[in-house]
Amino acid sequence: MPIGVPKVPYRLPGEPYTQWIDIYNRLYRERIIFLGKEVDDEIANQIVAVMLYLDSEDPGKDIMLYINSPGGSVTAGMAIYDTMQHIKSDVVTICVGLAASMGSFLLAAGTKGKRLALPHSRIMIHQPSGGTRGQATDIEIEAREILRVRRQLNELYAYHTGQPLEKIERDMDRDFFMSAEEAKNYGLIDRVIEERSN
């Protein structure tokens, strides 16, 4: 049974009374974005809009992107990726639970030195998948496009992890799961969060 979006109390600075706002808006006020579902156009548009707003509001101040996602659309994910690379603010990425496929790509795309994971997180990389129907010519066009996307993702993973392209290509041929510590050694993240800092 769905419970809806939780509401939390919030008091605007200088206001005498508290108002109730949904938890995601409260987190946005702290420059925290939560990707907790499959990456699709709708969630990508929301995340891009929030990142652009937060960057324009206070350029250079960190934005935190928490990721618990099984992956999703490559084109939607690339919209988030390009925005992360474009804005002035550093994007701190934190894996909570699972960062798979496009989720792991966005995790690795955080600002170098600020890519984190909780100790029991799982991270998975693999080649993009897709399917098509139609005439042989259309299928051939789709096949060329998915191979182009695969090359592009492999090159970007190699760039963000420091791994040789050949290793990335081998590892991404099938689902390749890692623990947080293994993801750190691989170069997908920079640090495993072992204890809460004050």
Curated annotation (Swiss-Prot):
Cellular location(s): Cytoplasm
Keyword Signal among UniProt keywords: no
An example Gene Ontology CC term for this record: endopeptidase Clp complex
Domain of life assignment: Bacteria
The reaction(s) this protein catalyses: Hydrolysis of proteins to small peptides in the presence of ATP and magnesium. alpha-casein is the usual test substrate. In the absence of ATP, only oligopeptides shorter than five residues are hydrolyzed (such as succinyl-Leu-Tyr-|-NHMec, and Leu-Tyr-Leu-|-Tyr-Trp, in which cleavage of the -Tyr-|-Leu- and -Tyr-|-Trp bonds also occurs)
PROSITE patterns, alphabetized: CLP_PROTEASE_HIS, CLP_PROTEASE_SER
Keyword Hydrolase included in the entry's annotation: yes
Active site residues according to the UniProt entry: S101 (nucleophile), H126
A biological-process GO annotation: protein quality control for misfolded or incompletely synthesized proteins
Molecular function in Gene Ontology: ATP-dependent peptidase activity; ATPase binding; serine-type endopeptidase activity
Keyword vocabulary terms for this entry: Cytoplasm, Hydrolase, Protease, Serine protease
One of the Pfam families matching this protein, by short name: CLP_protease
InterPro entries, A to Z: ClpP, ClpP/crotonase-like_dom_sf, ClpP/TepA, ClpP_His_AS, ClpP_Ser_AS
EC number from the UniProt entry: 3.4.21.92
Described purpose of this protein according to its UniProt entry: Cleaves peptides in various proteins in a process that requires ATP hydrolysis. Has a chymotrypsin-like activity. Plays a major role in the degradation of misfolded proteins.
Protein family (similarity comment): Belongs to the peptidase S14 family.
PANTHER family assigned: ATP-DEPENDENT CLP PROTEASE PROTEOLYTIC SUBUNIT (PTHR10381), ATP-DEPENDENT CLP PROTEASE PROTEOLYTIC SUBUNIT, MITOCHONDRIAL (PTHR10381:SF11)
Subunit note: Fourteen ClpP subunits assemble into 2 heptameric rings which stack back to back to give a disk-like structure with a central cavity, resembling the structure of eukaryotic proteasomes.
Name of protein: ATP-dependent Clp protease proteolytic subunit 2
Organism: Thermosynechococcus vestitus (strain NIES-2133 / IAM M-273 / BP-1)
